[in-house]
Amino acid sequence: MKTTIKQAKDHLNQDVTIGAWLTNKRSSGKIAFLQLRDGTGFMQGVVVKSEVDEEVFKLAKEIAQESSLYVTGTITEDNRSDLGYEMQVKSIEVISEAHDYPITPKNHGTEFLMDHRHLWLRSKKQHAVMKIRNEVIRATYEFFNKDGFTKVDPPILTASAPEGTSELFHTKYFDQDAFLSQSGQLYLEAAAMAHGKVFSFGPTFRAEKSKTRRHLIEFWMIEGEMAFTNHAESLEIQEQYVTHVVKSVLENCKLELKILERDTSKLEKVATPFPRISYDDAIEFLKAEGFDDIEWGEDFGAPHETAIANHYDLPVFITNYPTKIKPFYMQPNPENEETVLCADLIAPEGYGEIIGGSERVDDLELLEQRVKEHGLDEEAYSYYLDLRRYGSVPHCGFGLGLERTVAWISGVEHVRETAPFPRLLNRLYP
């Protein structure tokens, strides 16, 4: 009977065949231990010399790392294993033998591993990170579908930038200029006027020359837009979403979190409502903590965000930033018109901002004024202005960076490990 490593638990004391790769092996004179993986998990195969043909034991000792095999044997309980079971191997069939696999069981430098990212993905820890990434995506669809959101796919090639920045990748679109999308927000706002609540999940591109452990040039973003929604209601949706994702990973990725040696007690504390601190109060807090490199009207850097998040040891919303450091489309704060109705959600443990969101300007005259103040081409944003001409309503939205969120939940040090093939400032291969 052919099965997988994950399903093998359903076949205790039965003979099964598993297609797998050999990740590692060790042997003594009379027994060989094969570390097997098949994409669904990792399992040990035990080959006892006295219980198999001589050629099977010889093969078990000699087969090279990452060779592909069909391994047949009996599934038995093993309480020492993370899985709780192993295979007593009876026969081995080589599908394809590997030669001189470059990532041996010794330590390798980061650049070497990134050069061999196509192979590094096979390692136990990298496999665990990708499984957690997959669970975050699965839980995302579950949350939005259950809450009545419609998925909309905004274009990747755009004629204008939602953020109004210069950090864009430019390309030619026949005889026109086009840019790789930094965000699907403006298109999602249009879709929200048709469907009420919408979300998207797709790649975004930032031509930022950043080399920090938090930044990727290409990353995936989950964005939501909601009509007839105010800022306070939006924050509630955001914290419910993040809490749902964290709980889903805790429930469905126990083994992966164990492999990564993640301190899950920090994740278990994540619950609604999240702490909130205004930008004004955050500045005062930082001053009291001895930070003299930040003044009102300036954006926070990584050390500032870390200090604020560590104070709460939970995800924390920083609300109502100064108007001048935020994009043109954010709604003024009625209690202080020098600030806007926005929030960044900062993850604890130094992982930084994972969500940025705001209430959107819904008044046509104000939005036209903002477009001019930011030096933007009004014609390029005419479709966006139309949304305020024809039945404008209060509405809000937010965007969550997938890779940064996965880094926080999985506890990996650098965001590059959370993308299958990360694009960094100096890396376009593989």
UniProtKB/Swiss-Prot annotation:
Its EC number is 6.1.1.22. SUPFAM superfamilies: Class II aaRS and biotin synthetases, Nucleic acid-binding proteins. It is found in: Cytoplasm. The keyword Translocase does not apply. Keywords: Aminoacyl-tRNA synthetase, ATP-binding, Cytoplasm, Ligase, Nucleotide-binding, Protein biosynthesis. One of its GO terms (biological process) is asparaginyl-tRNA aminoacylation. It comes from the Bacteria. GO terms for cellular component: cytoplasm. It holds the Pfam family tRNA-synt_2. Its main location: cytoplasm. InterPro entries: Aa-tRNA-synt_II, aa-tRNA-synth_II, aa-tRNA-synth_II/BPL/LPL, Asn-tRNA-ligase, Asp/Asn-tRNA-synth_IIb, NA-bd_OB-fold, NA-bd_OB_tRNA. GO terms for molecular function: asparagine-tRNA ligase activity; ATP binding; catalytic activity, acting on a protein; nucleic acid binding; transferase activity. It catalyses: tRNA(Asn) + L-asparagine + ATP = L-asparaginyl-tRNA(Asn) + AMP + diphosphate + H(+). NCBIfam families: asnS, PRK03932.1, PRK05159.1. Homodimer. Belongs to the class-II aminoacyl-tRNA synthetase family. This is Asparagine--tRNA ligase. It comes from Staphylococcus aureus (strain JH9).
